[in-house]
From Swiss-Prot:
NCBIfam families: lpxK (TIGR00682). It is an enzyme of class 2 (transferase). The gene is lpxK. GO terms for cellular component: plasma membrane. It catalyses: a lipid A disaccharide + ATP = a lipid IVA + ADP + H(+). GO terms for molecular function: ATP binding; tetraacyldisaccharide 4'-kinase activity. GO terms for biological process: lipid A biosynthetic process; lipopolysaccharide core region biosynthetic process. This is Tetraacyldisaccharide 4'-kinase.
């Protein structure tokens, strides 16, 4: 593996060099960044692949959407549409992407969710539709520098921190590690239970200043479907369906609950399910005494319209997740809110 990385290193240097030149051009003002009349909080990473952005974004929404008129803007990775799309109750993952759809299912009218490849155009459209909009959360926008933001929150996985990785293709980084200097706070995700919080010094060596570092974990909720919660029996058999970057933590959780996974349908991240996929799972279910089929909530929002189309509901479930906090979250939340308030005050002074 190390030998392969060494072979790929010249390509990584080329890729990283191109992104470094681009960042330098933004730093010097040669590429224009737009300041829009709204507070902007960016949640992102410098590593390709899942780092747990969605549950952390939900945490921010829980904290701030009730205080400030808020919208989430995402690129909508994996969607089949183009341009600006505002999420509605009729939206599908094909229209807005699976993660924005998952965020919208929790919105309950408190915040708006939209997708647009051009983040500047997306925010401008949101301001047209919601004139009293105060806060925009940019989902996965760390490299999208055309919009000036008030807070840059960098996420990194505990088991695979950015400072121990290489730039693509030798590693998974989208840019050199010094991209972390743009962060105003770092969130360490997927921290194992009872893990020592020893990575802070390594993280702060790569940031521009002493900034808040928050350690979080993934907490799994009760298995459920549209009819309510389901209680597993000891050693009950199940079929697991996953279309996420790393299903292993979910597998470990189900095993810890003494659930016997007899089959796993494993798809790539952001996979778009088809009726043929559902039929294949259904055939396996019917051939195995109606064994329960369980999946992530991210997969569920894509699968449930197909289940309705086939008039299926019983025996299909998902495991919801939320973020758990291992370290003091107040310093980070105070940092974010202070910058939001400062931005809104400046906007008020100029109106």
């Amino acid at each position: 593996m190390i030998f392969l990385k060494i072979l790929l290193l010249p390509f990584s240097l080329l890729y990283g060099g191109i992104t470094a030149i681009r960042n330098y051009a933004y730093d010097k003002g040669w590429y224009k960044s737009y300041t829009l009349p709204v507070a902007v909080v960016c949640v992102g990473n410098i590593k390709a692949g899942g780092t747990g952005k969605t549950p952390f974004t939900q945490l921010l929404l829980q904290q701030f959407a009730g205080k400030y008129k808020t919208a989430v803007l995402s690129r909508g990775y994996g969607r089949k549409t183009k341009g600006f799309v505002l999420a509605t109750a009729a939206s599908t993952s094909a229209e807005i992407g699976d993660e924005p759809l998952q965020l919208y299912t929790h919105a309950q009218g408190v915040y708006a969710v939209a997708v647009c490849e051009d983040r500047v155009a997306g925010v401008e459209k949101l301001l047209q539709l919601i004139p009293d909009l105060k806060l925009v959360i940019l989902d996965d926008g760390f490299q999208h520098r055309r919009i000036n933001r008030d807070v840059n929150i960098l996420l990194t996985e505990y088991q695979a921190p950015f400072y121990a990785d290489w730039v693509l293709p030798a590693g998974r980084l989208r840019e050199f590690r010094n991209g972390a200097t743009r962060a105003d706070a770092v969130v360490v995700t997927k921290t194992p239970a009872h893990a020592a919080l020893l990575k802070t010094d390594n993280i702060l060596r790569h940031t521009a200043k002493a900034i808040p570092v928050l350690y979080t974990t993934i907490e799994y909720g009760a298995t459920r479907n549209e009819d309510g919660n389901y209680t597993w029996q000891p050693n009950e058999k199940a079929v697991l369906v996953t279309g996420i970057a790393n299903p292993q933590p979910l597998v470990q959780y189900l095993n810890s609950r003494h659930i016997d996974i007899i089959k796993q349908f494993e798809f790539k991240d952001h996979y778009s399910y088809t009726l043929r996929d559902i039929q294949q799972m259904l055939d396996y279910q019917n051939a195995n005494d109606g064994v329960k089929i369980v999946m992530t909530e991210k997969d569920w929002v894509k699968v449930v319209p197909l289940l309705r189309e086939l008039n299926l509901s019983k025996g299909w479930y998902y495991v919801p997740i939320q973020i758990g906090i291992y370290s003091d979250q107040q310093q980070l939340l105070n940092t974010v809110e202070t910058k939001i308030i400062d931005r809104l005050n400046r906007l008020t002074q100029h109106t």
